[in-house]
């Protein structure tokens, strides 16, 4: 995760940045340390920098941030980043880069600059910086008319960094574990690219439940305890009966592309999402459907125009279905009608570039959401407030609280979701962290 403290010279970026990095135990970088000697001399002479002057400076900063990102290291950068094109250069993929604008009036900042000594930036250049400064629509705005310590605490709270956890590996050597579910005190999951349904026993050992002829997707159980599993490319759902797979529902005439995750409620109703398009071939994103399989009835579409419907959960009262729209970077809620139809669609949380995958509802109504493109599991309240972040060892794709007391979170992760790479690397893990 990268935090960029931005704004004009003299707004306290370096001071707040150092304190913030110390508070989070992250690395701190000051963009002033990356300026070329000729740029420092130019500013010291009272001449503002232009775009050409700043280009190599921004290139070096962007390369440095990219290296931190590749190594999954978190960093705080103090950088003016005055123009939108500068910010785009620093963060071509903004999902894991958070801009924080330390904002104050010209008069307040000028008074501070006039008292500053030992810096190459003269106070008379402040007006040119305000002239160059362009709004950053996605930035967190923090008013500088408060102490640096207060600003740090505001940033930490607003970015959901008051609670930061790190996971450890419980099991590894898997290909692509997905869809973790608890059943009879054991953790079941699919190892998708190994084409297996697996379970983890109470002692932490793994065993195979069944091999599948297709990529297995979501899991669930009917009220009588019969396990259901999605066959992704065949677009069907099978039941597991005495170690054999039996057809349960054919969705091939309804699903736009490969089926994916599935949610089965206590009444035996199953909702199934699908890709909508050929993800791994690089096709253009297209909307998909959510399909309902009612007990003893024919499958039917109950929601359309959903962007890559993925992980799902149902609220404790059974009245609301929550679904991750992965490549829309949002979580959506529907009311559930008596017949299973989904109505009154609304945004539960806008994740602002983070892609939600598997998710799980906590007992208090908050959500744990795996977001693979930022390598974090987010703890969310409805409306999008981030209550906490889990930094995982691998790329997280799904998660579920431990049973029965929800004191731990189990996370399925891998280094890649590409089928060939997943089979070769066997980087899949079950990770775990305490959440209480």
Question: What does each model-found stretch correspond to?
Answer:
Residues 163-173, 202-204, 345:
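A short helix->beta-strand "capping" segment at the edge of beta-propeller domains
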Residues 196-198, 236-238, 288-291, 330-332, ...:
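A short loop-to-beta-strand structural motif that recurs across blades of beta-propeller domains
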Residues 115-154:
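Small-molecule kinase domains that catalyze NTP-dependent phosphoryl transfer to phosphate-bearing small molecules
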Residues 18-61:
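Conserved substrate/cofactor phosphate-moiety recognition/catalytic segment
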Residues 334-340, 435-436:
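Short loop/turn segments immediately following beta-strands, especially the blade-tip
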